[in-house]
């Protein structure tokens, strides 16, 4: 059942919305040549729009809830181990990407850029070169 759910929630739409699959070693090698400043610019100008478009395409609307669902689907389909802990109104994430500090910064930047549009934000963030953890709360 879970494999079928994953397929319908992300893989089914990935090609339609312009996402491609890359191996971790390839992505890690590319990211090692990208500055944090450049990655932040890319995250806000390009990737923010792509994630918003993906969410609208998959769920028909962009809300905090549909964005969080598409984030979960994207992480799962990308085989990036993560935990999403729902605690009342707070969503807590622990993401073990193993793709370097630049990717940690990328994740937090793109997620925060979208959340800010809804008066939500990331806080209590901890970034390492292997993982990122944060909470999502209303501002």
Task: For each feature predicted by the language model, list its residue ranges.
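N-terminal accessory segment detector
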Residues: 1-86
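Short, hydrophobic/π-rich interface segment
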Residues: 73-130
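Beta-rich nucleic-acid/ligand-interaction surfaces
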Residues: 127-139
